[in-house]
Every structure is written in structure tokens, then in C-alpha cells.
From Swiss-Prot:
The lineage of its organism: Bacteria, Bacillati, Bacillota, Bacilli, Bacillales. It comes from Bacillus licheniformis (strain ATCC 14580 / DSM 13 / JCM 2505 / CCUG 7422 / NBRC 12200 / NCIMB 9375 / NCTC 10341 / NRRL NRS-1264 / Gibson 46). GO terms for cellular component: cytoplasm. PANTHER family: TRNA N6-ADENOSINE THREONYLCARBAMOYLTRANSFERASE, TRNA N6-ADENOSINE THREONYLCARBAMOYLTRANSFERASE, MITOCHONDRIAL. Keywords: Acyltransferase, Cytoplasm, Iron, Metal-binding, Transferase, tRNA processing. InterPro entries: ATPase_NBD, Gcp-like_dom, KAE1/TsaD, TsaD. Disulfide bonds: none annotated. Fe cation binds at H117, H121, D307. This is tRNA N6-adenosine threonylcarbamoyltransferase. Pfam families: TsaD.
């Protein structure tokens, strides 16, 4: 009888402002997962400063790697492959992780696999439950808002994407206008839970049948609403404005996801990306798909929504099993395309 050997993959993630390392077994089981966040260092600047991010990655990369192995009680002799975020992201930040992965791969003779950051977010779902195909992933983060159709493992077709601001980017810009701290998304989400969506704001549906998104008009509408109220000496409750803004964003995201899921006849809808931690979005998706028993909704736990290396190891496992290998001329690719990955 054939017994398949367990596959242990070391994941490394440094695409933005988290330095992370993890070890995952067979693409589904987290053995260790270590994340060093830099949020406090970037808060006073109101956003991620690339130079600061890169410096922190240099300081933290060895520490998180050592901790990942310590938590797993494993050594490099136990590792079958090293998966690293190749892109997209901040080029200086990416280079820290990529160079660390290449050095370890070369020194230890362990195969190297480059991973697309968004593929990682999608495969965070596989760390919770196996993915059934065909599936559609709603990817919502600070830099990306996409609907991705998957007919099998490692197959990605972007059927809808933002034409301007990503949803997470719109959240941060609106939060800054409202005087809320960075990162703005969680603050708006928290305020929205206490408010009423009574401020009229637009929803960008675009042309009929389109799965694309646009949030720049909504962002401008919020800014204009605040400016007009100020000119008249009026105040708008931040809870109500947050609830109204969030409802406009979520309405479009959920409606287009449901339409796409129906049109493509999928078995599962996967939520992915940092904004997947948003309580309002999670609740709206759960409510919508609770009445669609033929479509299963997968939502990762909060710890796997934001950037982490376990998701990179999970996606890297799929690539490794398909025979994909990275070369030592691998570089950080800030504009890496998901469909060509």
C-alpha cells in the first residue's frame, strides 16, 4: 500500500508591513505561524512608509524564522520546500523575503517556490476547509479588490477588479478625512456597528453585467458630504457616516459576488484579503449565502485574513505539487499578475 509522505512547506511573507514565517503540512495544517507587525511604526505617518517597512523586515526576518521553527519543534531537515511571496507588494519589502528564501534554499538544498500574494490570501481558506471547484474568490484588501474564478487548484481568472481605488484603500482615505487613526478600516467598521446608514451615498454598479468595481466616486462623495456639512455649520455623526459608507461598499461587493457565483455555477465562494476581517462584510455575505444552500461560503478566521506566511505556504504547496519551481534569479515583482502566475 502506498502511503503518501507528508509535505512540509516553510512560508515567508514580507510584501508590505508584516514580517512573517510559517510551517504548513500538506497545504492544510498549520504547524507554526509567526507574524511581526509594524503598524505602530507607520501610524504617525498615516500609511505604510516603504523605507521603514524594509528596515523592519531586515530586523525581523531572522527572528520570525527562528520562532517558526521553535514553535514547530522542527529543523530545516524536515522542510520539503520554501515558499515566498514574489509579488505584488513594495519592491524593497519583497526583496527581503525573496533574498532570505533564496539564500536558505541555496544553502540547504531545499526547492524554492515563488507565490503570488493574492493566491496566498485565497488559499488561506484551505487552511480551514478544502476548496471545492469551481469556486469564486472575493479578494478585498488595501491594494486589491477582485473577483477571481477558479476551475481547479492554481487556476486563476480575474473576472472583475477595481478600476481605481481598492476597497481597503477607500476605507483608509475616508478614515483619514474623518480624522480617524491609521489603519482606518477597523475604525470605520467599529463605528458602523453603532450607527445608522442614513447619509445618502452613491453605489458604482458600472455597466450592466460588469463584475468590476469603482470606489473613487464614493470616496469623493464622502469628502464632499463632510465639506458641505462643515460649510453649513452642521455635523454628521461619525457613526452614521461610517455606517452609510460601509453599506455602500458592502452592497456592491456582495451583490456582484452573488451575481458572479450564480453566473459561473460555482460550488463555493471564498472571502480573502485583509478587509475580509470586516465584521459588516462577513455578516452581509453570511446573510446572502445562507439562502443559497447550493453555494458554500468560506471565510477564514481573523488571524488568517491579514498578511501571514501560513497562507503563502498553503499556496506554495499547490504550486510545488504542480511541479513549479523558483529559480535563483527570482526577484521581487511589485506588479506581478495573478493570471500569469
Amino acid at each position: 500500500m502506498n502511503h503518501k509522505k507528508d509535505l512540509y512547506v516553510l512560508g515567508i511573507e514580507t510584501s508590505c508591513d508584516e514580517t512573517a514565517a510559517a510551517i504548513v503540512k500538506n497545504g492544510t495544517d498549520i504547524i507554526s505561524n509567526v507574524v511581526a507587525s509594524q503598524i505602530e511604526s507607520h501610524k504617525r505617518f498615516g500609511g505604510v512608509v516603504p523605507e521603514i517597512a524594509s528596515r523592519h523586515h531586515v530586523e525581523q526576518i531572522t527572528i520570525v524564522l527562528e520562532e517558526a521553527f521553535a514553535q514547530a519543534d522542527m529543523t530545516f531537515d524536515d522542510i520539503d520546500a520554501i515558499a515566498v511571496t514574489e509579488g505584488p507588494g513594495l519592491v524593497g519589502a519583497l526583496l527581503i523575503g525573496v533574498n532570505a528564501a533564496k539564500a536558505l534554499s541555496f544553502a540547504r538544498g531545499i526547492p524554492l517556490v515563488g507565490v503570488h500574494h493574492i493566491a496566498g490570501h485565497i488559499y488561506a481558506n484551505r487552511l480551514v476547509q478544502d476548496i471545492q471547484f469551481p469556486a469564486i474568490a472575493l479578494v478585498v484588501s488595501g491594494g486589491h479588490t477582485e473577483l477571481v474564478y477558479m476551475k481547479e487548484h492554481g487556476s486563476f481568472e480575474v473576472i472583475g477588479e477595481t478600476l481605481d481605488d481598492a476597497a481597503g484603500e477607500a476605507y483608509d482615505k475616508v478614515a483619514r478625512t474623518m480624522g480617524l487613526p491609521y489603519p482606518g478600516g477597523p475604525h470605520i467598521d467599529k463605528l458602523a456597528q453603532k450607527g445608522e446608514a442614513n447619509v445618502p451615498l452613491p453605489r458604482a454598479w458600472l455597466e450592466e453585467g460588469s463584475y468590476h468595481f469603482s470606489f473613487s466616486g464614493l470616496k469623493s462623495a464622502v469628502i464632499n458630504t463632510l465639506h458641505n456639512a462643515s460649510q453649513k455649520g452642521e455635523t454628521i455623526a461619525p457613526e452614521d457616516l461610517s455606517a452609510s459608507f460601509q453599506e455602500s461598499v458592502i452592497d456592491v461587493l456582495v451583490t456582484k459576488t452573488e451575481r458572479a457565483a450564480e453566473a459561473y455555477g460555482v460550488k463555493q465562494v471564498l472571502l480573502a484579503g485583509g478587509v475580509a476581517a470586516n465584521k459588516g462584510l462577513r455578516a452581509a455575505l453570511e446573510k446572502t449565502f445562507s439562502s443559497r444552500p447550493e453555494i458554500e461560503l468560506l471565510i477564514p478566521p481573523l488571524s488568517l485574513c491579514t498578511d501571514n506566511a501560513a497562507m503563502i505556504a498553503a499556496a506554495g504547496t499547490v504550486a510545488f505539487e504542480k511541479g513549479i519551481r523558483g529559480k535563483y534569479d527570482m526577484n521581487g515583482q511589485p506588479g506581478l499578475d495573478l493570471t500569469s502566475y
